[in-house]
Amino acid sequence: LSFCLAACCNEIIESPESKSEDDFTSKMGLHILGSNDTRSSISPDEDQIKNICVMAYDEKDGRLACAQTARSADEIEMELRAGTYNIYVTANMGEFDAPIKEQDIGDAFHSIEDIAQLGQALPMCWKDRTVLKAGEKTTLYAKLSRLVSKVDFSVETGVLEGLEITSVRLCQAAGVIRPFMEGGS
């Protein structure tokens, strides 16, 4: 007994092996938008970025697909498989310890050991969801949010005779920041 099967097709169907890696990957860059919502009257450079960390989590399985730390957003370029990603960005926190599973991102933290650690570059963050298409470069436009505020206090005692300041106290200064915790840190 013999059996024969034949088919006709007008189009050539490419097998996945015949496609190049570029047909499945996408490049992602980052651009930081200026923050005009809050500006300092004392130090105009508080929005500067000394370092930035970008983490991309695959929406399908919630796992870390890529993480990069750089001195500026211009240095960030990720190559990822086409798909949907949740992107998390931290600034001025050094190399952020990105968890492997996205569900653990709320527990990730940054410690502030000393107020001098903040300098003029305040910790900031941003998150968003993006779809990356195969063979295309996508630029994300991030508007970072400050995670701390800085208060400078100065008094000219010569203006008011008899004024004597005995103490100044700052309450509720964060020692730990959890930038992506639901409801704040």
Feature map (PLM): residue ranges:
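Sec-dependent N-terminal signal peptides
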Residues: 1-3
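C-terminal motif of bacterial Sec signal peptides marking the signal peptidase cleavage site
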Residues: 5-7
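Short, low-hydrophobicity acidic/polar segments
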Residues: 10, 16-21, 26-162
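Short helix-loop boundary/capping segments
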Residues: 157-185
